[in-house]
Amino acid sequence: LSSGATATTARAFSAADLRAFAGLSGTHAGAHVPEPLIAGLVSYLLGVQLPGRGTNYLKQELEFHAAAPLDTEITATVEVTRLRPEKCLVDLWARCALPDGTELCAGRALVKAPAGMFPASGA
């Protein structure tokens, strides 16, 4: 775990995915991918890749700029911007975009990572 480290994942959501989400959330399936599904890609990265297993999600702030069409790959990226090993905290920048570069959302996240993930202080 180091400042500047990144992780990326990509996924396209189908009409069937939206119907399943609508059934779980009590909403209706629309013509675009719902923002919570897009934000879920960031959540996945934080819990599975960076920092990864054992991470405790504290805060996420995403500002959405565009709608995501169905069956179009969405790429989510997170980057470590600050490490606070004394508190086991990690600040990250997050972004989701379409293949043409259109930014769907961007923002930040704060997580608590297991102490063993931080580099030794050298003290």
Annotate each predicted stretch with a short phrase.
Residues 3, 70-123:
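HotDog/MaoC-like acyl-thioester-processing domains
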Residues 1-55, 59, 118-123:
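Hot-dog-fold acyl-thioester-processing enzymes
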